Amino acid sequence: MKKIEFNLLEEPWIRVRTPDCALQEVSLTDALLHAHEYAGLAGELPTQDVAVLRLLLAVLQTIFYRVDLEGSPSPLTDEEDALDRWGQLWEEKRLPEKPILDYLTAWRERFWLFHPERPFYQVLEAQIGTEYDAKKLNGEISESRNKDRLFQSYGGTEKDSLTYGQAARWLLYLNGFDDTSAKPKGKGLPSVGAGWLGKIGLFLARGNTLAETLLLNMVLLKDGQELWAPPCPYWELDQPRSGERTEIPLPDNQAALLTLQSRRIFLYREEGRVTGYRLLGGDFFERENSFCEQMTIWRKSQEKRNAPLVYLPLRHDPAKQLWREFPSAFAVESSTHTPGVVRWIAALRDYMDRHLFIQFESVGAAYGDKDFFVNDTFTDTLTFHRAVLDTTNTETRNKITQEVLFCEEIAEAVGDLAKEVAKSAGGQGVPETARARFYFAIDQPFRRWLASLDPEEDMDEAVLSWRSQAKGIARQVGKALVEEAGPSALVGRCEKIKKGNKEIKYHAAPKAFNHFLWELKKIYEEKGGNKV
């Protein structure tokens, strides 16, 4: 029997970034106790950081649902109690030592990466699962197989095996973002799809320190409204589930969800390094209306006209900037389900400085071929005044949403212009490329405008100023498309269109550009309600 090795509470394995941008590896205990000293997590991929963050959040949720800041037993009893406890933690700006050490000391034996009976985030039954080498465990290498790389991040021994610290980080990532390549061992088992974190559009808040990030995402109230059931993280189970592809009820507490075992995994080691692993499908639940998940954007789904409306987690589009998802993430309409973390932060308005800037981040993995492999990972951020989320500022969010929708309409008009200009030169335009060009041009200006908004100031004036800027950017992009088309597009060409009687349509860049300007005017004057 191999020896017990590598306790995650004591050994360094979590990668953090200091304020001066230095990287360190620290233990789970140190990551929590010194979280106020770190700028944030700094793993190999943003998806890995989210997996580690959720583990840390599960620990904090469990502790502070049960005890106060001094470590004395004090279970949360109502919503006001939860908000007050969070407010006390936020005011401290650091996580209290005693309750954290008391809890981790009590559960130390459940945090061994290698253990003959209870290896962390693993089960012995997975030894019959699909076999993979260390390169597959390393998400950085696995993901990079789908790209041409001039310079490899790993080579030699580092490519064929992992340190225990690396393996621990990638173990969490694998549990959350694993693809669908593993073959089931049992017969007639359901398809579980990608790991839970790979199925959703991850959406979280970022603070100035790791401690702030943890507190902002420590959602003590479901959707900012009601208490969860008592916490029960995976490691507290008397007997962890080990069955292959097991459907479970929706978790009723955050600790259980944050430590969901989407996969059954068993790591193999040799001479102090991890050389491979075996894997089976693990726990899963229905995605429909799975509102226990607080860190995702949602989309409405209604398959039939009279069928009940349901919500599904919305995966992020890697080609879509986060500000373009503002309507889904922050909308006011009752028919839209905003992310739980957004509702939670809105509920904290009395405990936070209204002038505080909040940064939200989207994180995702882009899969290929029915989630059979990971093509890429991506992240994006969005920053604005916390006061924008107040219930008294619904009109502000409505105005921002409207401007996002106007930008989408402009992008469509730019695409139509590109197609028409190309026809004027005798070619076939690619509207998608032109739309992407417009979004690139307007991306940073929109972010700056959003960050500058203060709900206490004149929003109508801010909106008019933005519309003037957006219209100018659109004109510049449109003008560039016309100029790049060349002289032949200015002269134009005739196209015969067969619709009943013969009809001839004339294509010319000047004509197309004038129509484009008319479209801009129609978007902002007819639909916007104010002239620019």
List each model region and its residues.
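Extended alpha-helical scaffolding segments
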Residues: M1-N146, Y173, D178-V532
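Cys/His-coordinated zinc-binding microdomains
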Residues: Y164-A167
